[in-house]
Amino acid sequence: MLLAFAKYLSDNGITPKRRVYVHITVYEEVGHGGSASVPAGVTEGLAIDMGCVGSGLMGSEHKVSICAKDSTGPYSYSMTTKLINAAKESGANYAVDVYPFYGSDVEATLRGGYDLRHGLIGAGVFASHGYERSHKDGVEATLKLLAKYLEV
């Protein structure tokens, strides 16, 4: 999804109003994906992962999920509020959820000693770590939110 977003920006000659670094990792599953290589001066970290879907959750495959809290604690209140406002302003179909059995790369960034505001979003995905199912509506909602948040 991030590569498609970067291609969209490049193909259309769009430059975000803020500096954006893309950090793609394959270590999220072992808990240290975002713990290193954060450039100096970075003040926010936004993980774009999957949005959980299931019993007791508000998310669906047709929405972008904004995680307010996971197994390690709450995400930055100010950043989560900005993400919710960006979702509303962009018209993205969204849900705010708590994931009690989940951890993200941006949480690893904090454990790595970086001091930044942090947030987590993702397109709704049903049945993770198996036969994962998502819907283009959830992907589109995620991209709408991301574009609004990054001010493109």
Located regions from the model:
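Active-site-adjacent substrate-binding region
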Residues: V64-V152
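Acidic/histidine-rich catalytic neighborhood of metal-dependent amide-processing enzymes
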Residues: M1-D70, V106
